[in-house]
A protein has these predicted regions:
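Phosphoinositide-binding peripheral membrane targeting modules
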Residues: 37-84
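Acidic, Ser/Thr- and proline-rich intrinsically disordered linker/docking segments
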Residues: 2-3, 7, 61, 69-139
Length: 139
């Protein structure tokens, strides 16, 4: 079972194992001031072999995905553009299928435009599934 507080604390202290992917960025000063979160630690997303933990700010609960509770994931992409533009805006997320039949949408709240977070999730979940199917514990 994933302990999100322990994962976030270990990553924040710079002690993340090589098998973890850690994403962080400085909190925007203006936005932090306006939301009343300027004293909060910076946003932090940690993807481990067991799941995902994300801290956004003190006003939001820690987001957790425990890979053991999933039955599958599906990559989803939607594109949009304006008629007078050659630029396409991509919206990328994962449909997360839970063992209890629920389906939810996963996209990092703080790193939504950094597609490598979705790639890291897919890689970690795939490795987790491979280890589990071989009867091993991912580490």
């Amino acid at each position: 079972m994933l302990d999100p507080q322990a994962v976030l604390a270990q990553a924040r202290q710079g002690r993340a194992p090589a098998s973890w992917r850690v994403f962080t960025k400085a909190r925007g000063r203006v936005r932090g001031f306006l939301r009343g979160t300027s004293a909060d630690p910076d946003p932090l997303l940690v993807i481990t072999p067991d799941g995902v933990a994300e801290y956004v700010d003190s006003k939001k609960p820690v987001a957790v995905v425990d890979f053991d509770s999933l039955s599958g994931i599906s990559l989803r992409v939607s594109g949009s553009t304006f008629s007078d533009s050659i630029q396409v805006r991509l919206d990328v997320w994962l449909d997360v299928h839970h063992r209890d039949g629920r389906k939810s949408k996963w996209r990092s709240a703080s790193f939504a435009d950094q597609y490598q977070t979705v790639q890291a999730f897919i890689e970690a979940y795939g490795a987790h599934q491979a280890f589990r199917s071989a009867g091993l514990h991912p580490r």
